[in-house]
Amino acid sequence: MYIHELNPIAFSLFKLKIYWYSLSYLFGFIFSYFYVKFILNKDFVNISFKIFEDFLGWAVIGVVIGGRIGYVIFYNLNFYLDNPIEILKIWQGGMSFHGGLIGVILSIFFFSKLKKIDFLNLLNLVSSCAPIGLFLGRLANFVNKELIGRPTNSDWGVLFFENDVLRHPSQIYEAIFEGLIIFIVILYIIKKKYYTSINVSSLFLIMYGFFRFTIEFYREPDSHLGFIFMNISMGQLLCLPMVLLGLMFVKKKNVGY
């Protein structure tokens, strides 16, 4: 058993509270920056590092705006329609991965058109470092005591709140499978140059969708939504088109190979 006593505030700077949740995004982009520099030396995609640097700002906008709008629309629309100012309070949590994914894909689409580069190449590059952000983001969710798991009697159960039951650390499950494992698999494909026959972005969609769908069975559904039907949550529903889309294009190789 683990008693959760972590503080969501990392530190304060001149009365400004810096949250672990915000830092997870910051370090996600920083680590991705250096990781992309590494994998581009493996001839992974026909894109220069300068192009990726130019895209970073677009990626930040896509993730933040898409993630927030996705959460508002998919998970708590009525609340935010009644309290629109709350939409701006991103530091309190409330981001949707699926919304962030759509936001980033749109950013990639418009950026690739502007720079006249191949959309799929940039999508594969971004997909290769997405697990880094997922890993850090899920750890931040754990610190924030959000997206908590369902009750469990296991030895690794977590007591998130006083007078509550032990719960699955579903955020840690997601950090391991959606973050660490997908990262290792994609890195292996890049190092072995299997990307000439396997589309990395499609593989990411399939693996993430499968892991997220499975782990949702150990995670409490959003209290204001509950299950959409039977024991299926909104997150699981949103994973289905991801997997189907990934299966459609998994054999489409990178341009130039």
Summary of predicted features, one role per range:
Residues 1-257:
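A feature for loop-to-transmembrane-helix boundaries and adjacent hydrophobic helices
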